[in-house]
């Protein structure tokens, strides 16, 4: 029994070492027509990028900082620093631009843990006029947060929130809780947060989360 336990521990240790080596290894290429080079360094746990123009890129750090890379140089000071919950898969997770507005998706504590979308005005390469755009569920789980934002061809904002291990009706759990904005792709009017008018599940109740759903079961 002792020999078996020792052997098992050795195998587990080797697996962890191999996984860590793969995680931090240099990228490898199988296409000889491609090359890999370092573009910028000094960023901590990047989660998303947003190209503002050909010279300026916003890079999100999981711990709440929005960093600006301008002409290939990482600027010393963050454009925005949010206080976020970084446990497991929580944190500053997504960014998107719609016109002259920039949206950020982050997990925050405001009485309870929630996923919050912030809206900013883009002024040059600065983010101004912070406002809370929309609050979404952030519990029960610390993983499966989602957090990605995108803009549709018709100018609406997409937001993805994971199911948070909630196991609701929108995950085909018959006796589960009703939809609550989790486990879904939302399509949102970027001006006022209302649901896009062509969303497929709109009903008579204006407060029904399904009005915002573009897809569910995420």
Task: Specify the residue positions occupied by each region the protein language model found.
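Positively charged n-region of N-terminal signal peptides that target proteins for export
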Residues: 1-4
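Bacterial N-terminal signal peptides
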Residues: 8-17
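Blade/loop signatures of beta-propeller domains
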Residues: 22-35, 74, 194-205
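Acidic, Gly/Ser/Thr-rich repeat motifs that build Ca2+-stabilized beta-propeller blades
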Residues: 26-168
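Beta-propeller blade signature
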Residues: 116-124, 173-191
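Secondary-structure boundary elements
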Residues: 125, 151-158, 187-201, 206-207
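Surface-exposed intrinsically disordered loops and tails
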Residues: 170-176, 203-208
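Repeat-solenoid scaffold signature
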Residues: 207-218
